């Protein structure tokens, strides 16, 4: 739905042009699905990972234009550093959108949506996408650890979305096992 676009409430939603927009659209999809069915929804952060690269390219273009307008040159390393700093901020905003949208959504049946977020780095198709997915997962876990403030201003851990992180441990066979095969 994110890669190919979708229709929500009679409005065509095209492929997002940034990570934060992809996060916003994902929460709109969650809201629509949750309002028309009982039970929960699961999403994988892997579906959002390609939009990190979309934002990276967009930010890189913005930085290049800003440097040109200022008549300033910067080393490729410095440009990359500025781009990655802005990208991390974009990821923070996008993850925060998901967090707050899911926490504050009420479906038409009067319930908060039962959302599960799946995080598995090996779903990524390329090394760059895996790196980008790792940044999303890191930010998701950081924000969950921090929590959200309740109406009294006290930090709490929200009930949703539920987080599932897959961690595969690889143990190499002992040298003796290799000789026996």
Predicted feature descriptions by range:
Residues 120-122:
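Active-site beta-loop-alpha junctions enriched in small/polar residues
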Residues 170-175:
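Conserved small/polar residues in nucleotide/adenosyl-binding loops
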């Amino acid at each position: 739905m994110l890669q190919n676009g979708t229709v929500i409430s009679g409005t065509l939603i095209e492929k997002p042009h940034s990570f934060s927009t992809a996060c916003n659209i994902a929460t709109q999809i969650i809201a629509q699905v949750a309002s028309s069915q009982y039970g929960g929804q699961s999403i994988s952060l892997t579906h959002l990972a390609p939009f990190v690269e979309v934002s990276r390219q967009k930010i890189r273009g913005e930085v290049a234009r800003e440097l040109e307008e200022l008549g300033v040159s910067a080393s490729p390393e410095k440009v990359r550093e500025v781009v990655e700093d802005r990208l991390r901020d974009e990821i923070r905003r996008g993850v925060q959108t998901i967090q707050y949208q899911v926490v504050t959504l009420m479906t038409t049946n009067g319930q908060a949506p039962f959302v599960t977020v799946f995080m598995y780095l090996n779903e990524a198709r390329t090394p760059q996408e895996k790196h980008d997915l790792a940044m999303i997962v890191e930010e998701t876990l950081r924000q969950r650890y921090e929590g959200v403030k309740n109406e009294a201003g006290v930090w709490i851990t929200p009930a949703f979305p539920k987080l599932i992180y897959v961690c595969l441990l690889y143990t190499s066979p002992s040298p003796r096992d290799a000789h026996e095969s």
